[in-house]
């Protein structure tokens, strides 16, 4: 169990986990609020 805990706390595993979390969060935000970036700029 200690070896698994050591492996999961290494930098590449934590970085990939963080990137997957951020990507999923951005996908869900875009699903509920589509085109949020384009709505902030007025279109004339």
Curated annotation (Swiss-Prot):
Protein family according to the UniProt entry: Belongs to the PsaJ family.
Highest taxon above the source species: Eukaryota
Keywords from the named record: Chloroplast, Membrane, Photosynthesis, Photosystem I, Plastid, Thylakoid, Transmembrane, Transmembrane helix
Topology of this chain in the membrane: Single-pass membrane protein
Residue spans crossing the bilayer: 7-27
GO terms under cellular component: chloroplast thylakoid membrane; photosystem I
Any one GO biological process: photosynthesis
UniProt-annotated location(s): Plastid, Chloroplast thylakoid membrane
Name of protein: Photosystem I reaction center subunit IX
Pfam families: PSI_PsaJ
